[in-house]
Structure formats: C-alpha cells, structure tokens
Amino acid sequence: MAVLVVSRGGGGAGAAGWAARLRAAAPGVEVRAWGGAPGEARPPLEDVVHAVVWRPPPGLLARESLPALRGVQSFGAGVDHVGALPAGVPLARIVDPAMSQRMASFVVCNALNHIRCTEDYRSAQREGRWAGHLAAERERDVGDVFAGVMGTGEMGGAAAEMLRAVGFRVRTWSRTRRRGPPAGCEAFVGREELREFLGGSDILVNLLPLTPETSGLVNADFLAHLPPGAFFINVARGGHVVDEDLLGALDSGRLGGALLDVFHEEPLPEVHPFWGHERVLVAPHVAAVTSTETALAQIVDNMRRTLEGRPMLNLVDVAAGY
C-alpha cells in the first residue's frame, strides 16, 4: 500500500516537500510525490490507496489511474480543485479554526479600509495632495453600512460575526438552510431571496463554496442588483465571478470597487486588466492561509485512517461539493 502526494501550482513546499514531511511523521509508510508538471514521469500508481492532492491533473483520481484508491485528502479547506472521484471514494478537507479567524480579520480590515477611504488617502499621498475633504464627502460610519455575507459555513459565519462585532449591520445569504446565520444577522436563503439580499448590501463578501450551482454566479445581472457604488470582496473562488461582467460594472461606476483575493487563473496573469484597474485591489490568495502544522497533523491522521481501514475525519459531502 502506498500514499501519493500531488501538488500543482499551490506554492509552498510542493509535492516533494510535503511527501518528505509525511515520511518523517509516519515512518514506514510508502509516500510518493508527483508534481504533475508536463513531461514529469509519474511514480507507480497501481498500489496507491490514499492521495493527498492540490489541483491534481484531470483524470488522475479515476479508477483507471488509481485502481486501489480508498481515500482522498485535500491540502486545503476547499475541494473544488479536486475534480471527479470514483463512486464511493471519500474526500476530506482541512479544518483549521484559526483559518476562519484569519479570513474574518482580512474581510473586516478591507471593509473598514473601504468605508474609511484608506486607498483614496494613499493615492493622495502619492500625489502629495492633502485630501481632508474626503472625510466629510465619502467616509461612512460603520453603523450605517450594511455588509452582506454570502455563505454561512465556518468562514462565512466567522466573517459575519466579526463584521457585526465592529458595528456593521450584517445580513447573510445561503443557498440552503443547512446552517443558520450568527445571532443578530438578518438571514436570506435561496434564489428567491437573493435579489432582496443584494439590494441592501453596501459591501458584499463572497464566501460561498464553488459548486456547479454557484459557478459564474457573480455576473452582470447579479451585479446590477447591488446598490450603486457597492464594494465587492471576493475571498472564495475566482470561478464564482464572470470577470468581464465585473470589469464592466467597475468601469461604469456601477460598482464602487473590489478587493479580489482569488482568480480563475493563479497566479493572476501579468496582462490581466485587474492589475491596473484603479477600483481593484489585488491580493495573491492570502486571505486565510492554512497553518502548516494544523494541516500536517490532519493529513497524517487521515492518511493513517485510510491505511488502517478507518473512516477519515472532516469528510466532504461530495454530491454537494462542500
């Protein structure tokens, strides 16, 4: 029995580095690494029973490639990168409580920066311009601003709670009622309530899982229902957004600005118009980086569970996608 580690484009230690960590943590376990680069030879796969993956190549996890596969572990909290799995093969993700707090603080920081015009003051500083008039003309009191959070999972719930704690008026939206919103937040559920939710969200935070139902959700029609000048924070996945429609809303002034931490292609290509757009702040997918120590402990535990025939922890509902 063997374990396969595959990591493509995720930065950090890469497949070889993670494989070395797993070997050190679990002596005697056969751990093989594959970076998935074009032309890179694959290691033997026929006896692989457990795979630890980040953006595996399409088809790698199919039964034809890994006939002995019994369990798959994502390197991150998200699993949209994994792709299709053979029927009956369980999928686990990383659950890091501190990650939710890191995400929440990132969201709150950028929401406050927006209503206090921080980027405008930085622009004025570069120009040597005293811009005290902005305080009266554009700044807003936190208690007058409605922050809408899409997604009420661990991260969405943490972001909603922290936004409310600093004084924002918080509303949440989720596709289903699987989990309720934090106390004190106005809840909206389902497609039939989405427009009402959007219409009252001065700041919109996307923390939805990426599924076939949410892919491309943030399009021209969606953005048209936000209040004029709304601010969009995307810290979920780039696949939620139709880039051309978002750029159109920004160019027209319909949308006041956007903080984007995730993209269709990462790293974001140098020629992408987001880089130079005056209303866009680009972050390199750093809103909530997984703790290496936390991830390693969970990965090793689930690896051993699969090898010993025990159920993994932090399992994903494969049909739902999260």
Predicted regions located by residue number:
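Redox-cofactor binding/interface segments in oxidoreductases and associated redox assembly factors
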Residues: A51-V53, S74, V205-N206, N234, ...
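C-terminal helix-to-coil terminal segments
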Residues: R93, M99-F106, D120, A124, ...
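Short, conserved loop/helix-junction motifs that constitute active-site signature segments
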Residues: L60-A68, G83-G88, L223-P228, A249-R254, ...
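Rossmann-like adenosine-cofactor binding region
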Residues: R177-P273
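Phosphate/diphosphate ligand-binding glycine-rich loop within oxidoreductases
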Residues: E46-R126
